[in-house]
């Protein structure tokens, strides 16, 4: 099936379409990259995969060729027409906003139990436009119990920030939140020429394998607020950044710094994941 799947340019011509720049549409056509992403998302035949933004169906076809069960999310009606025309009933097509999905419902409908006693989970895969990367990642983190892995094609700079080591220049809010929940790695760099039309910057394949959280926190929602506040004003010390966010009164903040062993004169980007978690626990 994949040997004869038309190129992005051929499909756009067949359906008299053009890539929508306002939607961030750059269609991946490189067969080696498509194969790598499909292998990472669906290592075994029968795996349940949720594809976000299926587009023209190139990755979808690769996933089907590996024996995956694919539910494809797409809200562009032109792309829906292509997917129905090329792949028909071989996929479950969901016309929905990829940033507003109910993963519990989707996992119950399409997922498979990862281990005895666990609820059904999904692998999530997609070529994400820049403007949707953060909303989609936050949505997944809010519902992480229903996701086993995520494999995304992202702008290279974004992927490298998400996989950045603690206390590095690229360490940020989503780095902390994602790495607390998953083992995160950049699997390969993808040049602009792998797409049609080619984007202006390089991309990268990011893989996140979800697992039990690395460091316990008392209140996950408060942990997120704490990390966002700590990185919100990078030039400020933690004492000033967290004080401005009014997460606690000054005396309680100082006591938390002391109990966690964190110098309040440091800046947020210098803290490790374990230090962020310790600081949140001591605020309790």
Curated annotation (Swiss-Prot):
Record's subcellular location: Cytoplasm
Keyword S-adenosyl-L-methionine among record annotations: yes
EC number annotated for this UniProt entry: 2.1.1.182
Record: residues binding S-adenosyl-L-methionine: 26, 28, 53, 74, 97, 127
GO molecular function: 16S rRNA (adenine(1518)-N(6)/adenine(1519)-N(6))-dimethyltransferase activity; RNA binding
Record field: catalytic activity: adenosine(1518)/adenosine(1519) in 16S rRNA + 4 S-adenosyl-L-methionine = N(6)-dimethyladenosine(1518)/N(6)-dimethyladenosine(1519) in 16S rRNA + 4 S-adenosyl-L-homocysteine + 4 H(+)
Location (main, coarse): cytoplasm
Record has DNA damage as a keyword: no
CDD domains to which the protein is assigned, alphabetical: AdoMet_MTases
Function: Specifically dimethylates two adjacent adenosines (A1518 and A1519) in the loop of a conserved hairpin near the 3'-end of 16S rRNA in the 30S particle. May play a critical role in biogenesis of 30S subunits.
HAMAP family named among the record's database cross-references: 16SrRNA_methyltr_A
UniProt family annotation: Belongs to the class I-like SAM-binding methyltransferase superfamily. rRNA adenine N(6)-methyltransferase family. RsmA subfamily.
Identification of the protein by name: Ribosomal RNA small subunit methyltransferase A
Upper taxonomic lineage: Bacteria, Pseudomonadati, Myxococcota, Myxococcia, Myxococcales
């Amino acid at each position: 099936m994949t040997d004869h799947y038309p190129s992005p340019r051929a499909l756009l011509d067949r359906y008299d379409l053009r890539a929508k720049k306002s939607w961030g549409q750059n269609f991946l056509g490189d067969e080696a990259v498509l194969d790598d992403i499909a292998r990472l998302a669906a290592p075994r035949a029968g795996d349940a995969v949720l594809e976000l933004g299926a587009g023209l169906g190139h990755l979808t076809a690769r996933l089907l060729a590996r024996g995956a069960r694919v539910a494809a999310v797409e809200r562009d009606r032109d792309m829906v027409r292509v997917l129905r025309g090329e792949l028909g009933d071989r996929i479950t097509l969901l016309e929905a906003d990829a940033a507003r999905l109910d993963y519990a419902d989707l996992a119950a409908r399409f997922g498979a139990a990862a281990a005895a006693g666990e609820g059904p989970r999904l692998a999530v895969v997609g070529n994400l436009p820049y403007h949707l990367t953060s909303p989609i990642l936050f949505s997944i983190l809010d519902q992480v119990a229903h996701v086993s892995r995520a494999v995304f094609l992202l702008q290279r700079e974004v992927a490298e920030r998400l996989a950045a080591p603690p206390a590095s220049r690229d360490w940020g809010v989503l780095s902390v939140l994602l790495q607390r929940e998953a083992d995160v790695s950049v699997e390969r760099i993808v040049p602009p020429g792998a797409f049609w039309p080619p984007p202006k910057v390089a991309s990268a394949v990011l893989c996140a394998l979800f697992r039990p959280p690395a460091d316990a926190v008392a209140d996950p929602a408060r942990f997120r607020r704490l990390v966002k506040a700590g990185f919100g004003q990078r030039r400020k010390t933690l004492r000033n950044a967290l004080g401005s966010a009014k997460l606690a009164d000054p005396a309680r903040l100082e006591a938390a710094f002391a109990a966690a062993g964190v110098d309040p004169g440091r800046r947020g980007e210098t803290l490790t994941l374990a230090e962020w978690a310790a600081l949140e626990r001591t605020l309790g």
